[in-house]
Amino acid sequence: MENSRSTLIIFFAYTTIILIGSINCRDNNNNNLVTNQSALFVFGDSVFDAGNNNYIDTLPSFRSNYWPYGQTTFKFPTGRVSDGRTIPDFIAEYAWLPLIPAYLQPSNGKNQFPYGVSFASAGAGALVGTFPGMVINLKSQLNNFKKVEKLLRSTLGEAQGKMVISRAVYLFHIGVNDYQYPFSTNSSIFQSSPQEIYVDFVVGNTTAVIKEVYKIGGRKFGFLNMGAYDCAPASLIIDQTKIGTCFKPVTELINLHNEKLESGLRRLERELSGFKYALHDYHTSLSVRMNNPSKYGFKEGKMACCGTGPLRGINTCGGRMGVSQSYELCEKVTDYLFFDHFHLTEKAHQQIAELIWSGPTNVTKPYNLQALFELN
């Protein structure tokens, strides 16, 4: 018995040394990283935000750095708009990358960026005029990426810096706030211009940023189309006379966006040599879970875990609208598709991430992210 115990101690000590050694190797040898791994650079909004809004001057409603956000995995609020990990966190795990940090996180070091970084900001849009001064819009996220690209070239050397950029995967989720903003501000934009023109601006700004990343050296891109946000808990309670009814004014915008995004990506594939992409049908993935939650292991597909009011669809989770404001929190978060009025639970994020990573072509096409990461 004593000999067995000694053998176990020696074994665990040995494996610990091996593990620590391998971590140190990865941290201290950028050449190995450049040779063997593709980085992950993340652009977008609250669906992808890893905590950038913690470090900008904005309203509490644009932050999630308070309890119960982060309760499941991290056990503290990180700024992610969920009870735990988000889609990029799982994608990084599947790609054997460390957790991708927020760009503005003070602890970031120059050795961290070769693995990738998240520029995403809750509330951000493709249009500069969406929640101006409150968020880091897509154009500003691009500018931050350009700073990282210069830093990579200066720290790794010109050739290796370019290699990180060319082998990296660039993940995008953007646009929903551009469609939400006019309604939340009672804008008359849709009275003065057709919806299709507005959608053209949103998708056009997105593709312009993609072209800029391509020009710098990016070749592999991942996208989520627009989810069924017209039927999220917050949307289901907009018409108080028809609780549970999707918000139809946004439905057409979402459908137009998804059509134009898909056709725009096909056009870029024809125009840009070496451009490869994965487009996940997030709209369908979300809709089927809303309408048939039990099939996917949920009990609630339309009520949020955290919030107040009908379906907990009012944005009060964690006291977002004021410290003294109360909110309700469900007992078992894994029963729920939505964590708050608009955002998914960690369990839901993992399911979606798996489809983006290795899903068949009827849900993620023409490549999935696993295939893109394996391309060099």
Curated annotation (Swiss-Prot):
High-level lineage: Eukaryota, Viridiplantae, Streptophyta, Embryophyta, Tracheophyta
CDD domains in the cross-refs: SGNH_plant_lipase_like
This protein's encoding gene: GLIP2
Similarity remark: Belongs to the 'GDSL' lipolytic enzyme family.
Gene3D superfamilies, per database record: SGNH hydrolase
Signal sequence interval, chain numbering: 1-25
E.C. number(s) listed in UniProt: 3.1.1.-
Protein name: GDSL esterase/lipase 2
Catalytic residues in the record: S46 (nucleophile), D340, H343
